Amino acid sequence: MSKASLKKTLAGMDADQLRHLVIEAYEARKETREYLEYWLEPDSKTLAEKFRKDIRAVFFTGKEKPKAKAHPRLSEANKLIRDFRAMCYDTEIVADMLIFLAETEADWLSYKYYRRSWYPSVMRYRQEAEKYVETAGLEALYSERLRHLEKNINILYRHI
């Protein structure tokens, strides 16, 4: 359904029908529930903490040990970042979350002895974070952290 047809359909509904639709969507989808809760009470820091835990869980067990048998599902981490960016409009917190993802993957790699094939992945996340930081004009806030991350990634690459 296109946006135009959605608008047309919603315009034809009365207040009770709209209320019912929103409640159904709230109950049906976790993402919708999170979005509506954030929309009603925007608290970027609490939202960021929740997503930090979820991203960390992609790479580590509950006891902060790297997941042993399976590789982390980067598609899951990417989805978390997409969902976070869709909800949070605070550029500083989004930049922090992008850097956190790269730091978490680098941290996971420091525990594991994987092939060099993981290096491009962690560098891609770092570069994406750096590009976002530059676009948002937050270099003064995050340039040192990005340099430190790149240094750590390069040290890991030499030891793999």
Q: Where are the predicted features?
A:
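Basic helix-extension-helix modules of the SAP/HeH family
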Residues: 1-40
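Eukaryote-biased, non-catalytic alpha-solenoid scaffold regions
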Residues: 5, 34-160
